[in-house]
Amino acid sequence: MYAGDYTPRERTQSDRWDPPSYLNVLAQEYKKLHPHVTIEFLPEITPQDRFDTWIFTQYQAGRGPDLGTQLFSEVNRHYLKGWYVNLKPYLEKPNPYVEGNKRWADIFQPGALATGVAPDGNMYVLPTGVVGTGIYYNKDIFARVGVEPPETWAEFMEIQRKIQAAGYIPFAFPMAGAKATTNWSLRVIQDMILDSKLPEIKGTGEPVVRTMIEGEGISQKELVRAIKKGVYSAKDPQWQEQLRLLKEWSQYWGPGYLSLDPDAAYRLFVTGRAAMLYDTSAKIKVLETDNLRQFEFGVFDFPRITQESSPYATGVSAPAVGGYTGAGSWTVAATTIEKGIVDQVIDWLMFITAPQNYIPLANDLGWYSPGLIDLEGIDPKLEPFIRSVENGVFRIESFYRGLTVEYADQFYRVLQEYLTGRKNLEQATDEIQRYMEQAADELIERNGWTDLLAELDA
């Protein structure tokens, strides 16, 4: 089993907080009920890009973990390869570990189930971990400088100017290693900047509402159609505004941000050298227990972009980044069918997800809330992040998961060159547009969207 963030292990001398361990407890309890079952936990693999390489290599070789965890967006990119068991029929069966349950699916929040649905209508992943994001800030630095958490982008820029003038790094923003912080930032900024254009991008002319499902407002097929029609284009000044705002912000990220990875960014923040850090609910327990922290911290929402900062701003609030993308996006390998153990693996997953087991498991980790109907006993520190997601997440994907993996890498390289002045906006967007169109063509071919081709030719 590959459990990702839930992977249990012992605390080592280098740990500054307790690692998760509760899955060991559940495994022992399960073995009492099923003595013949052997449960082996694979070591956790980080960062995300290294895990992606490892897991795809394992599946290609027919060695994917019997029970694994993987983001729904990645699973739904690769489900046609036959790596995963369709969980939909099993979700219709009773969960024997939940009293009175007649249908396993009924214990999960509707958004969790909807998030896991693949383009073919089946479910190859059960995404049950609710995660939220926020901007963590050093209350002591804010007090010394005399600033308050901002509500608008203009205020955000102004407090960073003052913090920088006081001799601190305003924002620990990593651009080495995992692309998460850039991805989250552009998801939020793009959603606000393109707010007035989303109905045209979707192709319906109707308002695009926010839900708890990431990027649900604009499907990948709708995005590809908009690219082919020139509606979603890197050469559109409204689209370009997200890059301009990101570059404006980058002046406050401190020297060497291109070589700063997420661990180094966290260390800048926790040691008091940087005033802010954009991260997920996963940092709450870590910051609370890290003995390097010698200050009070708080969390605020990503600031709203207004007309004061951009002519394209509609004043819509910033969306949340998160949803059902935390620990516990469960997958079952198709090889379990050949091994004759698929029913046992599903049974073990039913045991894990029973509320009396899942809530303590989540609290032990302290990073995410399970996507269950019954959340009695969940750590109250996670509630603000849950509420932020309930208010709605971003409606359209950014560079990282919107198109192809190749496009994400190409975009990121060009973005770095733009932020550091090696390319101007025109040069950067010319190149991005070329890569964007290539990715759109590849997705049309890969997914067999002949109807889209016919529509474009009409």
PLM segments and residue spans:
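Conserved N-terminal structural module of periplasmic/extracytoplasmic solute-binding proteins
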Residues: 1-83, 92-103, 149, 427, ...
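Extracytoplasmic/periplasmic substrate-recognition and gating elements
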Residues: 3, 32, 144-145, 251, ...
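Short amphipathic alpha-helical coupling segments at ligand-binding clamshell hinges
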Residues: 22, 26, 241-245, 339-352, ...
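Short helix-initiation/N-cap motifs at beta->coil->alpha
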Residues: 44-54, 153-157, 257-271
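Paired acidic/hydrophobic, glycine-rich loop segments that form the ligand-binding mouth/hinge
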Residues: 66-69, 275-280
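Hinge/lid segment of periplasmic solute-binding proteins
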Residues: 74-132, 148, 204-217, 300, ...
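Glycine-centered hinge/linker elements that transmit conformational signals in sensory
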Residues: 160-162, 198-259
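Long, aromatic- and glycine/proline-rich binding clefts that accommodate carbohydrate-like moieties
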Residues: 300, 304, 311-316, 324, ...
